[in-house]
Amino acid sequence: MPKIIAFDQEAREAIRRGVSKLARTVKVTLGPKGRNVILQKSFGSPTVTKDGVTVAKEIELEDPYENMGASMVREVASKTSDVAGDGTTTATVMAEAIFNEGLKAVVAGVNPIQMKSGIETAVSDITEQLHSMAVKVKDQEAMANVATIASNNDREIGTLLADAMSKVGKDGVITVDEGKSLQTEQEWVEGMQFDRGYLSPYFVTDSTSMEVVLEDAYVLVFEKKISNIKDMVPLLEKVVQQGKPLLIIAEDVDGEALATLVINRLRGTFTVCAVKAPGYGDRRKAMMEDIAILTGGQAIFEALGVKLESVDLPQLGRAKKIIVDKDNTTVIEGGGKSADIKARIDQIRREIELSTSDYDREKLEERLAKLAGGVAKVNVGAATESEMKEKKARVEDALHATRAAVEEGILPGGGVALLRASGKVKAADTLTDDQLVGYNIVLRACRAPLTMISENAGQDGGIVCEKVLAMKGNEGYNALTDVYEDLVKSGVIDPTKVTRTALGNAASVATLLLTSDALVAEKPEKSGKAGHGGDHDMY
């Protein structure tokens, strides 16, 4: 495939155009008075969003050189979103500001490598300053404020998420699902719940709610299908002697085995319920082991040389209460040893750290929460599918941001933290002239987020920046109410992690672009005229 190459000024100019196109599209969404962007979809209704990373991911430019610049900045937005969950638009605005300032300096003859070193020093100094300004999140109100800001000033989402976070704690899992009603609701699932219901409605013990409720029950976890009741008879006899109910979790229970269990249940011989094992493949094995550890039993795997007919009561798990409906099974207060459960949780944590796939990480986090004792579910409600998609994305962003706030503390929002931090740092005397240029570029770029927030709110960005600089501490410009006030008190706050990540990622990509001097792209193919249809070319 032939390539096309651009050098020096031509290359930098092409990158600048690409960066500018992407940044201009994303910038309009910044701040409480930011505008929406409408994205065309190849099928279905267009998506209306105010989420920076969603907009950035959609942008592909026709010119291959411009597209390179745009996709590098797109990387800033998605990396910031992955790590901190919010701050994607701030990162894009910062990247453009650093790149544009740096480009002027490079054209004027500054050495890009020296300048890069100065930029990195400034980022490191400002990050240190941000950490020293950070305040720990102590109460639910502060969490609600963080979530409200991250969900584009939706107070309902903020309060819901803060409530959920306070229930599940720092390590707990909160899942975001599409709800069935117009309201966004939150539900709390205690104990370990998995999405498998009873195999026969004849197991039901409470006919009004159509649930099986087993108190102080035994739990059998078996990896294979159970079709023949003969293998189970010795175990069932021992359970009947104890007078306790039994939950069977297996790949499947069918045929004669299921029929015998149902008949004994209907006759009142003993209370029993059978459900399929959760998950698929290797994940199913891992989840079965989780259930066994939680209930203090042993997962019966034939690969380990344990046969079903030789299973004894000590190998069964125990649980204080088990509730099974047609879709879900919930095990409450399993009888597992806390040391074993803790060891299993630590093992899953290590797997999460090593995991490279987002999907695997999400599933591992779910398993972790189920072992740790509960999951909070947020069911997002909306009137239309388009609104549902947009709202769900906002809830997920807000969730990430709230987690980040609990982790590293909070700062005043509205672009003020960066402005304050940049005003407090000073370049060391040891820097060379070119490094000093890079250092000062970052200090000037720290004004960009506040300038953009003000301009989206219909104010003059330069004037607002100067007014805020003259103030002290957490005081700044609240674009939502158009008032200068203490931002932390009025709930305009950003997680430290979000601000720090946005600055770091923006500087990283901007310096990469500034130190690049040639672009190599594939030559676009010229497509010839389309052939005639029909039998035109027969004559």
Curated annotation (Swiss-Prot):
It is an enzyme of class 5 (isomerase). It comes from the Bacteria. Its EC number is 5.6.1.7. It is found in: Cytoplasm. The keyword Nucleus does not apply. It catalyses: ATP + H2O + a folded polypeptide = ADP + phosphate + an unfolded polypeptide. ATP binds at residues 29-32, 50, 86-90, 414, 478-480, 494. One of its GO terms (cellular component) is GroEL-GroES complex. CDD domains: GroEL. One of its GO terms (biological process) is response to heat. The keyword Nucleotide-binding applies. Keywords: ATP-binding, Chaperone, Cytoplasm, Isomerase, Nucleotide-binding. One of its GO terms (molecular function) is isomerase activity. Pfam families: Cpn60_TCP1 (PF00118). Its main location: cytoplasm. Together with its co-chaperonin GroES, plays an essential role in assisting protein folding. The GroEL-GroES system forms a nano-cage that allows encapsulation of the non-native substrate proteins and provides a physical environment optimized to promote and accelerate protein folding. HAMAP family: CH60 (MF_00600). Belongs to the chaperonin (HSP60) family. Forms a cylinder of 14 subunits composed of two heptameric rings stacked back-to-back. Interacts with the co-chaperonin GroES. This is Chaperonin GroEL 3.
